[in-house]
Amino acid sequence: MPPPEVATLLTGLAMGESPRWHQNRLWFSDWGAQEIVALDLDGNREVVVRTAFGLPFCIDWLPDGRLLVVSGRESLLLRREPDDRW
């Protein structure tokens, strides 16, 4: 069996962390840029959230689809509402 093919998906990240697959996109936190980014199957990058708080350590979703973010500096668990409020 041949080895799996390795490909670079994205460059230019400060520090990518907490990858999650959600709604057919790869989501992750870029700690250094203080962003939450989504990458689709065609390689299109979207900055979904630019955080006003500290480092977006980890992300996940509630069953109803609301985004959860752990903010490292403040030691907070934040929930993003449908109207983009935290």
Where are these regions (language model features)?
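Beta-rich, blade/repeat-based domains predominating
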Residues: 9-25, 51-71
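Short loop/turn segments that connect beta-strands within beta-propeller blades
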Residues: 40-44, 80-84
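Hydrophobic residues embedded in beta-strands of well-ordered beta-sheets
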Residues: 26, 36, 45-46, 67, ...
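Structural signal for beta-propeller blades
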Residues: 34-37, 75-78
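Blade/loop signatures of beta-propeller domains
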Residues: 1-4, 24, 33, 39
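Short loop/turn segments immediately following the C-termini of beta-strands
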Residues: 31, 72-73
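A short helix->beta-strand "capping" segment at the edge of beta-propeller domains
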Residues: 1-12, 41-43
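Short linear S-[DN]-x-LW-Φ motif typified by the pepsin-like aspartic protease active-site region
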Residues: 18, 29-31, 47
